[in-house]
């Protein structure tokens, strides 16, 4: 698509890449829903495949009584960013991502936190101050695992959106710009 002037940072949810992925994936999800209806109609289905919302919608279209929901790992990544900022700014050690409480809003790859706390500490003022102090250089991930390198970014788009809207964008910059052309 790029040679035609269509740019996509990821292409698994939105744009032509998302449409192509949906066309490839939906037929498989029809078969999955039929198999669940036939062999395990009481099972819960947890979907991590993209385009997530279309995959889950297909399951319900084929088998309306199915118990299914979709998840995205991006929320965990943003909890890790909050963990790192908390450790860096407050001098805390060994903060566990799982101990950061959040309220998640939105759709896959375009999720937001309107609440974030750690052991009773409201993280919004800490995050606000950090985004102001690091609006140019962003946040550098402490995780140097090569398997996570494709998700690495400085979170500058995330910081900018927080300053504009007052909510923490809970997806990586590469996904956020899919939904907001011209940002970043």
Features from the language model and the residues they span:
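Rossmann-fold dinucleotide-binding core
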Residues: 34, 44, 48-118
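A sequence-composition feature that detects small, non-aromatic residues
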Residues: 14, 19-22, 33-43, 68, ...
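Long, compositionally biased stretches enriched for glycine and/or charged residues
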Residues: 87-184
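Rossmann-fold NAD(P)-binding glycine/threonine-rich loop
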Residues: 2-63
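Short C-terminal domain-edge/linker segments immediately following a structured domain
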Residues: 14-19, 76-80, 132-137
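Generic detector of bulky aromatic hydrophobic side chains
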Residues: 1, 18, 24-27, 52-56, ...
């Amino acid at each position: 698509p790029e040679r035609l002037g269509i740019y996509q940072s990821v292409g698994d949810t939105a744009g032509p890449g998302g449409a192509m992925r949906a066309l490839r994936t939906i037929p498989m999800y029809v078969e999955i829903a039929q198999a669940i209806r036939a062999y395990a109609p009481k099972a819960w289905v947890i979907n991590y495949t993209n385009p997530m919302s279309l995959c889950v919608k297909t399951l319900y279209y084929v088998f309306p009584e199915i118990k299914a929901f979709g998840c995205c790992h991006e929320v965990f990544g943003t909890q890790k960013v909050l963990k790192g900022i908390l450790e860096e700014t407050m001098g805390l050690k060994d903060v566990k991502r799982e101990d950061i409480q959040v309220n998640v809003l939105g759709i896959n790859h375009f999720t937001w936190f309107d609440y974030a706390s750690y052991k009773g500490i409201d993280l919004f003022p800490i995050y606000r101050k950090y985004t102001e102090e690091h609006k140019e250089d962003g946040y550098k991930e402490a995780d140097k695992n090569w398997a996570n390198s494709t998700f690495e970014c400085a979170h500058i788009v995330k910081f900018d959106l927080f300053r504009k809207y007052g909510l923490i964008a809970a997806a990586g910059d590469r996904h956020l710009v899919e939904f907001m052309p011209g940002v970043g």
